Amino acid sequence: MYETYHSGWIECITGSMFSGKSEELIRRLRRGIYAKQKVVVFKPAIDDRYHKEKVVSHDGNELEAINISTSRDILLQDLSHVDVIGIDEIQFFDKEIVNIVEKLAENGHRVVVAGLDMDFRGEPFEPMPQIMAVSEQVTKLQAVCAVCGSSSSRTQRLIDGQPAKVDDPIILVGANESYEPRCRAHHIVAPSTSDEEEM
């Protein structure tokens, strides 16, 4: 007789800001709820733009979530009866999140994560490249460029209406007042302050 294994998997939803990542995460998790599956959602404490204890899309759709400070906080929860685990804004967690989502999948959970693939400079946003590599399914969403209306794959950070400098901090949580979607042609990263002084 053959043995059957109940194995979980990882689904990764990624793209620029305003591409609908949280919206898609909420949609997939709600389908699990409709199917009478036990669903638990986590979000990083740093993301308090709309609500501390809910995943909220830019369109206002929301789902209850557990606010956590570190990726290890996920393992402190009793997940023994949980079928589906959602994690929003995964790029804000430490690199240990990669091992944690793999462990959750190995324990039979369906893990659905969402987060940015690139930072405001257009560079890979760690640990998303590793999450994408270990995922069984990767969905890359695009927004619409705020300048020309074409497909947008990048996130433009604006400080007082001007492009952020290359040496600005990577993590700065904001919404539409400090970020907008841009295509490759209209994505701008200003030179560092020291480069400007040399000119």
Swiss-Prot record:
Domain of life: Bacteria
InterPro entries referenced in this protein's UniProt entry, alphabetically: P-loop_NTPase (IPR027417), Thymidine_kinase (IPR001267), Thymidine_kinase_CS (IPR020633)
The reaction(s) this protein catalyses: thymidine + ATP = dTMP + ADP + H(+)
Any one GO cellular component localisation term in the record: cytosol
Positions of ATP binding: G15, S16, M17, F18, S19, G20, K21, S22, D88, E89, I90, Q91
UniProt keyword Cytoplasm, yes or no: yes
Residues the entry annotates as binding Zn(2+): C145, C148, C183, H186
Cited PROSITE patterns: TK_CELLULAR_TYPE
Keywords, sorted A to Z: ATP-binding, Cytoplasm, DNA synthesis, Kinase, Metal-binding, Nucleotide-binding, Transferase, Zinc
Pfam families recorded: TK
Top enzyme category: transferase
Subcellular location: Cytoplasm
Record EC number: 2.7.1.21
Active site: E89 (proton acceptor)
Any one Gene Ontology BP term: DNA biosynthetic process
Molecular function in Gene Ontology: ATP binding; thymidine kinase activity; zinc ion binding
NCBIfam families linked: PRK04296.1-1
PANTHER family: THYMIDINE KINASE, THYMIDINE KINASE, CYTOSOLIC
The protein's assembly and partners: Homotetramer.
Family classification: Belongs to the thymidine kinase family.
Name the UniProt record assigns to this protein: Thymidine kinase
Organism: Staphylococcus haemolyticus (strain JCSC1435)
Upper lineage: Bacteria, Bacillati, Bacillota, Bacilli, Bacillales
Gene designation per UniProt: tdk
